[in-house]
Amino acid sequence: MEDFQKDRKEVIERSLRQGLQYMLTVGTDETYFKKVVEIINSYPAVYGAIGIHPHNSKDYNPQLGKIIAAFLKDKRIVAYGEIGLDFFKNYSPRESQIHAFQLQLEVAKRSRLPAIIHSRNAKDETIQILSKDYDGNLGGVIHCYSYDLAAAKKFLDMGFTLSIPGTITYKNSHSLTDVVKFTPIDKLLAETDAPFLAPHPHRGKRNEPSFVRLTIEKIAQIKGKGVEEIAMNLKRNFEKLFLHEDRGEGAEEPADQG
């Protein structure tokens, strides 16, 4: 969030001028939760998500779970996340990541909020946990999708949407291109992962929401469809996933905190 502290208003206005109707900002630990609420209450086009990112899983505890549950009552908080596993950097022990992930999945199911799943270098473990917990009551999105087609098919079979980042515009994105070709358009989203992973030709620079247009154009090219047709489909997917009214009342933490 610090990356946009000085020019957040200008960045959002630039995105709106590009025709972007919805944006999602994510609070990945307790220090950012109130900032997310401040942002979503200041900009009508921006919605929020909160959760404990796998990097911060070692800090997850029962009290923090209660704090999250309270924030989830805000109707403009439309998703639980990012939650998941990151075995690339391992900022938190793997056992802590798995424990926090499983507990937060239970809260997401009870709250009927979609989960935003972060998974890096943890494909098999993520699929195993989601498969074990899958009962038809958990939905969500695999954020910044980076795995192969075989994994994509497993996530899709569990009902998840795949969110495509700006890396799809890179020359070496052959595996991700195969995923986009295969995945039904109603199970795709486009994202920036700002400030990271700016699409070509902005690679290496600070990413921002307005750049998502470049990702959408690439998806349209791969699908052999018009850009506006793809954009409209992705808009509907966002609305269906995040802006539905079927929210649960009980977002309490599981009794067993382990």
Question: Model-predicted segments: where are they?
Answer:
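Mid-domain alpha/beta scaffold segments of enzyme catalytic cores
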Residues: 1-258
